[in-house]
Regions:
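Catalytic-site microenvironment of enzymes
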Residues: 1-169
């Protein structure tokens, strides 16, 4: 899965390959195609940051049109409550799923454990939960410790994101 840098409300640096709301359609499409081609083969994309871009329905439609053409899925990190990603994905027949919990906004052991337990509770209640984390040393260490015991101790099974994708009708 390609974490695609997208414009945030806070105007954080996106780095090379980022997509923003000021781009014309041709620039947006060219930048997106370059990113997708640079990291192929991939199966899907998620937004890295992106609170401003994912709230822009027109640009989400542009994004989903390219993902649909390549039969790629989209994982919405839900960095804003105003995200339009799921609506655009459904309209353009792109398989998608949205984040339920961020694991590592707080990287302390207590913070990681709190969010992990929140995800477990949601998974039990809803039948699934999408937990997004980053490759921080603290997060990796936490997951190395907790994942091996997940099914036996917690009664929750880890699955790939593809198993949770919502297929548009």
């Amino acid at each position: 899965m390609l974490p695609l840098p997208m414009e945030s409300m806070a105007s954080l640096s996106m780095g090379e390959g980022g997509l923003d709301t000021q781009m014309s359609r041709s620039v947006f499409d060219a930048r997106l195609q370059a990113s997708l081609n640079a990291f192929s083969p991939i199966q899907g994309v998620n937004n890295h940051m992106g609170s401003k871009l994912t709230a822009d329905r027109e640009r989400m439609d542009w994004l989903m049109a390219q993902l649909a053409a390549r039969q790629l899925f989209f994982v919405d990190s839900r960095t804003t409550k105003d995200t339009q990603a799921a609506f655009a994905a459904q309209a353009l027949n792109v398989d998608s799923v949205s984040r339920d919990v961020f694991l590592d906004n707080e990287r302390s052991t207590a913070g990681l454990e709190q969010e992990f337990k929140r995800a477990l509770a949601l998974a039990r209640k809803q039948g699934s939960a999408v937990l997004i984390g980053h490759p921080y040393p603290e997060s990796l260490s936490f997951l190395e410790r907790r994942l091996p015991e997940l099914e036996e101790r917690e009664g929750v099974r880890l699955v790939s994101v593809q198993a949770l994708l919502t297929r548009p009708h």
